[in-house]
């Protein structure tokens, strides 16, 4: 069993190299085998003015950056790197935001103190099923998460998916599906800042102690984080590095952060929100020419 699993890890590394070299392929309808991925989304844990910048620009209370007072052009935003830290915004920043995700995002909505925010979440959802699983009901009509999102316009869209996908061992499919979803979000939300949140680490010791699935590893999770960073660079959307903010010295989620090794405790959901509030960027900063790249 362990020999077979180690070979899966080796294969994952080989596939990652191929994916990073290939870039986004045309829309890929292969979604991996459902038999290889169990649902990991059931949790038992759920417990004003402008700020001047050194270059003369300013950041308003809602986190929007303006050009320097002398009218000079700011350096182009570097989509290949994680979003840099910015002055903290308050919860009102998220009033025109939508959050897409699985049960981890559901926990963020419930336990972080973010307030009333539009969420498009579903327990057990994966990037492979985002365009096919009718998980959202609006006025008695069932929609996929992508279809439901198109019913309203937002200025920010946050997406965080990948834990339920770890068992598929389909890295190219994960990458291609993520690219397609970002394209779909851009099409339905042309004026939104899109934030891809990478995956917060797992605590493998806790998962093992609770008899959790062997495929839930930080090694494969880091592969997915590399892939989502590449998606952000290629599609020119914002990449948020939650992993680095939460990983412990041993390369895992701290033991006190989760009772099942996957979902967070209340204090850590609050820390997640604080990270989001200190990593924001305006649409104008990202796309000074007035339109997001395709």
Residue ranges and their predicted role:
Residues 87-177:
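Conserved SGNH/GDSL esterase-like catalytic core that processes O-acyl groups on lipids
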Residues 202-294:
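Catalytic His-Asp segment of secreted/periplasmic serine-dependent ester chemistry enzymes
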Residues 21-23:
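C-terminal motif of bacterial Sec signal peptides marking the signal peptidase cleavage site
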Residues 3-11:
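Bacterial N-terminal signal peptides that target proteins for export
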Residues 27-96:
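N-terminal, intrinsically disordered, polar/charged segments of Gram-positive cell-envelope systems
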Residues 178-182, 225:
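Generic structural signal for well-ordered alpha-helices
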Residues 98-99, 156-160, 193-198, 238-241:
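Structural recognition of the beta-strand scaffold that forms the well-ordered cores
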């Amino acid at each position: 069993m362990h020999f077979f699993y180690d070979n899966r890890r080796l294969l994952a590394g080989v596939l990652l190299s191929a994916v990073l070299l290939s870039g986004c392929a045309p829309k890929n309808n292969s979604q991996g085998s459902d038999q290889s991925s169990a649902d990991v989304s059931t949790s038992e844990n759920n417990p004003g003015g402008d700020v001047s910048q050194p270059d003369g620009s300013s950041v308003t209370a809602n986190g929007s950056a303006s050009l320097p007072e002398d009218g000079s052009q700011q350096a182009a935003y570097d989509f290949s790197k994680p979003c840099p830290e910015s002055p903290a915004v308050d919860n009102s920043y998220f009033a025109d935001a939508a959050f897409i995700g699985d049960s981890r995002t559901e926990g963020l909505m419930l336990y972080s103190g973010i307030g009333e925010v539009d969420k498009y979440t579903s327990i057990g959802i994966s990037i492979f099923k985002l365009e096919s699983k009718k998980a959202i009901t609006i006025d008695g009509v069932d929609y996929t998460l992508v279809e439901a999102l198109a019913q309203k316009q937002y200025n920010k869209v946050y997406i965080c998916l990948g834990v339920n996908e770890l068992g598929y061992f389909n890295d190219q499919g994960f990458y291609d599906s993520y690219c397609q979803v970002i394209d779909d979000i851009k099409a339905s939300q042309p004026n939104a800042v899109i934030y891809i949140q990478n995956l917060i680490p797992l605590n493998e010791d806790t998962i093992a102690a609770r008899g959790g699935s062997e495929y839930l590893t930080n090694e494969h999770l880091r592969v997915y984080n590399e892939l989502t960073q590449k998606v952000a660079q290629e599609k020119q959307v914002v990449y948020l590095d939650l992993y680095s903010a939460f990983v412990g010295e041993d390369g895992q989620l701290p033991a006190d952060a989760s009772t099942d090794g996957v979902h967070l405790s209340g204090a850590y959901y609050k820390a997640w929100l604080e990270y989001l509030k200190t990593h924001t960027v305006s649409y104008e900063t990202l796309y000074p020419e007035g339109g997001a790249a395709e």
